[in-house]
Amino acid sequence: WIMGHMVNAIGQIDEFVNLGANSIETDVSFDSNANPEYTYHGIPCDCGRNCKKWENFNDFLKGLRSATTPGDSKYKEKLVLVVFDLKTGSLYDNQANDAGKKLAKNLLQHYWNNGNNGGRAYIVLSIPDLNHYPLIKGFTDTLKQEGHPELLDKLGYDFSGNDAIGDVANAYKKAGVSGHVWQSDGITNCLLRGLTRVREAVANRDSGKGYINKVYYWTVDKRASTRDALDAGVDGIMTNYPDVITDVLNEAAYKSKFRVATYDDNPWETFKK
């Protein structure tokens, strides 16, 4: 999965997919009542990027729905996975469940079109704080209460705080989650980060008894770091330059081992070599 980083304006969806992304990451900010408000990152952000592009959250969802609904004039067949980077740092811990409920209602209405031929992409809820695990239950309970438990098949999870793998496993236990888990690891492109924890996550994924199904590394903009991440066995790479990742995947060393995921590849299934 080539994951376009910080795609917060509707126009950027096309831009990143055209460069080779089959997945995008979008920032979601919340107001003081735990309502998802904007797709917005703000300053500071990755080096070499405009941090200030934004949409109202529901407008972005509608644009995303167009891009992922077969038959729509804006449809992009390649775009199969969306990571919502939930900026819950502005919320109190006791608002996490509420944030999940409100997020689910917004997605149900504006992205999934109340279950009536909505967008088809798989969705990952990426949460920065382990204490905010109740967001997951708020979200999943709401889908069930609204009569759309089938949409849970399209839903995955990530804790993005680079916490110890054991602590993340614990948070999922508390949240009642088993399966559909992506584990992120990374840092802004302005800084360097080794692959120690990525290798630990990959080992958990491949052990057959860990909690992780997929591992992604962020934010990778250079060919050398792309090769290192692929050598470590990641499933996804988040990048500001999808064309760089595409180029490396076409190199002889990687062409036979990796391919770009399509809609038929289940993002919740651990790949068996």
Curated annotation (Swiss-Prot):
Disulfide linkage: 45-51, 47-190
Protein localization: Secreted
GO biological process terms held by the UniProt record: killing of cells of another organism; lipid catabolic process
Organism: Loxosceles spadicea
Single GO molecular function: metal ion binding
Cofactor entry: Mg(2+)
Purpose of the protein: Dermonecrotic toxins cleave the phosphodiester linkage between the phosphate and headgroup of certain phospholipids (sphingolipid and lysolipid substrates), forming an alcohol (often choline) and a cyclic phosphate. This toxin acts on sphingomyelin (SM). It may also act on ceramide phosphoethanolamine (CPE), lysophosphatidylcholine (LPC) and lysophosphatidylethanolamine (LPE), but not on lysophosphatidylserine (LPS), and lysophosphatidylglycerol (LPG). It acts by transphosphatidylation, releasing exclusively cyclic phosphate products as second products.
Full protein name: Dermonecrotic toxin LspaSicTox-alphaIA1i
Record's keyword annotation contains Secreted: yes
Tissue: Expressed by the venom gland.
Catalytic activity: an N-(acyl)-sphingosylphosphocholine = an N-(acyl)-sphingosyl-1,3-cyclic phosphate + choline; an N-(acyl)-sphingosylphosphoethanolamine = an N-(acyl)-sphingosyl-1,3-cyclic phosphate + ethanolamine; a 1-acyl-sn-glycero-3-phosphocholine = a 1-acyl-sn-glycero-2,3-cyclic phosphate + choline; a 1-acyl-sn-glycero-3-phosphoethanolamine = a 1-acyl-sn-glycero-2,3-cyclic phosphate + ethanolamine
Any one of the GO CC terms: extracellular region
Binding residues for Mg(2+): 25, 27, 85
The enzyme's E.C. designation: 4.6.1.-
UniProt main location, coarse: secreted
Cofactor: binding details: Binds 1 Mg(2+) ion per subunit.
Chain ranges passing through the membrane: none
Keywords: Cytolysis, Dermonecrotic toxin, Disulfide bond, Hemolysis, Lipid degradation, Lipid metabolism, Lyase, Magnesium, Metal-binding, Secreted, Toxin
Keyword Magnesium: yes
